[in-house]
From Swiss-Prot:
Biological source species: Dictyostelium discoideum
Keyword Secreted (UniProt): yes
Entry keyword set: Glycoprotein, Hydrolase, Lipid degradation, Lipid metabolism, Secreted, Signal
Protein name (record): Phospholipase B-like protein B
Main location: secreted
Role this protein plays: Probable phospholipase.
């Protein structure tokens, strides 16, 4: 009898336990479903705002008159472009260019550059002025810099001429042609002779991120004294140029987010979100015709970097930098700079592996970054994350390493915060010398942003959550910041004490986010300016910043919201 009673009680306990488990499981699934529905509603709301109507221009060419730009969307023209400068209303300008496959590739590229230079000429001059005054300290650019750039251009042109059947060099040639067209378009629109710019000037703007490492190759003897001030400026840029990146897989596998927050001097907040849709012929072997990216006046690469491609690849990077002077001798003009190699890799790749293999060619050893390539073709919502979804590549002079790191992503997220992931790159970059008190793993894992991502990344359930983490800065109340506004996902060096060593108009200057759902719409959501979620908006007129840093073309107050960008329109 007692045995029967005991069995009865045991069965009751088991049934009760199963019941509680099922209730908890159902509640958990309901919660996930609600979160997923909320996420979908947010994305629908993000993409359902009133779309702004862009003025459209077309461009044609004749041997007698050259290029002519006229109003209207002429499908028989070489290219059509829409442009609107909304810097004062949303913190971005927007540019879209589509070329016509009926014309030769070189004419498409030149026309695309020309119409961009023509339509954006005012912003290009503003960008050049800000760079000249702030980065070059209004001095003549040193001959060593100009000579290096000219040697690099000559090398590429020679390779283009020699390898006329190689898609890699064919596309390098088209990039140079596009930039040459932009120079001509800019100078045609600019009526002030004192503001004429050369092809080399445009090259210098595009190679701005590479210049920090190039300047470190110059001999520092007294015979090169003219380099001194320039190099000090470039060393500062290289030392402080960082970003935050995050790839986040939701717990229920229904969504995969990708985002990037650029860190830069606030002088670089003159922004254009760009869409290039180039219809080049099969000889170029391009896989991606359409590129949507966050950029700047006069640049044909992102430089942040953040790209959404029509091949459903998302490409982003954060800067690792180089703390090892022993590698600078490997940086030679006989190479292709990073800003151009990423364009070629974007065009020629059909996945993470091929992107890395293309980017690996002609390593310049400059602008040494951690690159993340997210292949949304490999992602099956709610089912699995297939191998090849996330590739990571890291570079130093003379060496590149890459790997499929999807297994790391399967644990929930991949963070990026300016410390190399691969041990060989970590050691070659000199991080082992900089961080002698801790092991490589500890240095990688215990960075402030690493700890913030570890604490907060798995709390991301929706698009709104994801946007918030990329704009996060609560340094006064977050113990992980140690009271430093720089130790946050979106830094604000300007909020540190004026007495501190790193007090400056520098920090996170934007955020760009996308996801599986948004990639299928060719949609990126972006916000311009320093974060103001938990902190006050940045204002040039405060703390005398406008007297320290000329910032023509920019609004005084950066309190803008998020903007939706597609390949043909934007809304906010």
């Amino acid at each position: 009898m007692n045995k029967l009673k005991s069995n009865f009680i045991l069965n009751i306990v088991i049934l009760f336990t199963i019941l509680i488990f099922n209730i908890n499981f159902i509640n958990c699934e309901n919660q996930k479903q609600q979160q997923h529905q909320q996420q979908q509603q947010q994305q629908q709301q993000q993409s359902s705002s009133t779309t702004t109507t862009l003025p459209i221009y077309s461009i044609k060419f004749s041997s007698e008159t050259g290029f002519t730009i006229y109003s209207g969307n002429d499908s028989t023209s070489i290219a059509q472009s829409g442009f609107s400068n909304e810097m004062m209303t949303m913190g971005w300008a927007y540019l879209t260019i589509t070329t016509n496959s009926q014309f030769e590739d070189s004419l498409q590229a030149e026309a695309a550059g020309y119409i961009e230079g023509y339509l954006t000429f005012e912003m290009i001059w503003q960008c050049w002025y800000n760079i000249l005054v702030n980065e070059y300290q209004n001095q003549t650019i040193p001959n060593q810099v100009l000579n290096w750039a000219n040697e690099n251009i000559a090398y590429m042109k020679q390779q283009v001429a020699t390898n006329e059947n190689d898609p890699y060099w064919i596309n390098i040639g088209l990039v140079l042609t596009q930039l040459s067209g932009m120079v001509d378009g800019y100078n045609a629109a600019n009526q002030d002779p004192s503001r004429q710019l050369s092809f080399l000037d445009f090259i210098l703007i595009n190679m701005d991120a590479d210049l920090g490492d190039i300047s470190s190759t110059f001999n520092q003897s007294t015979s090169f004294s003219e380099i001194s001030n320039f190099k000090k400026s470039m060393d500062h840029i290289k030392k402080t140029d960082h970003c935050s990146g995050l790839i986040k897989l939701t717990d229920d596998l229904t969504e995969l987010y990708s985002a990037h927050t650029s860190w830069s001097s606030y002088i670089n907040m003159l922004r254009i979100f760009k869409s290039y849709n180039f219809k080049f012929s099969s000889i170029t072997n391009i896989k991606s015709k359409l590129t949507l990216f966050s950029g700047y006046p006069a640049t044909i690469a992102s430089l942040d970097d953040f790209y959404l491609l029509d091949t459903k690849l998302v490409v982003l990077e954060t800067t690792n930098g180089l703390n090892n002077n022993d590698l600078y001798y490997l940086i030679k003009p006989e190479s292709v700079l990073t800003w151009m190699r990423v364009i070629i890799a974007n065009r020629l790749a059909n996945g993470g592996q091929s992107w890395c293999e293309t980017f690996e060619r002609e390593n310049s050893g400059t602008y040494n970054n951690q690159w993340m390539i997210v292949d949304y073709n490999k992602f099956v919502p709610g089912v699995k994350v297939r191998d090849g979804t996330l590739f990571v590549l890291e570079q130093v002079p003379g060496y590149i390493e890459f790997a499929d790191v999807t297994n790391v992503l399967r644990t929930g997220y991949w963070p990026s915060y300016n410390i190399p992931y691969f041990e060989t790159i970590f050691n070659m970059s000199g991080f082992n010398d900089e961080l002698t008190d801790s092991s490589d793993y500890e240095a990688y894992e215990e960075d402030a942003r690493s700890q913030i991502f570890r604490r907060d990344a798995n709390k991301v359930y929706s698009l709104t959550d994801f946007q918030a983490i990329m704009r996060y800065n609560n340094f006064q109340n977050d113990p992980l910041s140690h009271g430093d506004a720089a130790n946050q996902i979106s830094s604000r060096f300007d909020l540190n004490s004026p007495d501190s060593q790193d007090y400056d108009a520098f920090g996170g200057v934007d955020s760009k986010v996308t996801s599986f759902s948004l990639v299928n719409q060719l949609l990126v959501i972006a916000q311009s300016g320093p974060t103001h979620d938990q902190e006050p908006p940045f204002q040039w007129s405060s703390a005398n910043w406008s007297n320290i840093y000329p910032s023509i073309g920019m609004p005084n107050l950066y309190d803008f919201g998020w903007v939706n960008f597609t390949d043909i329109s934007y809304n906010y």
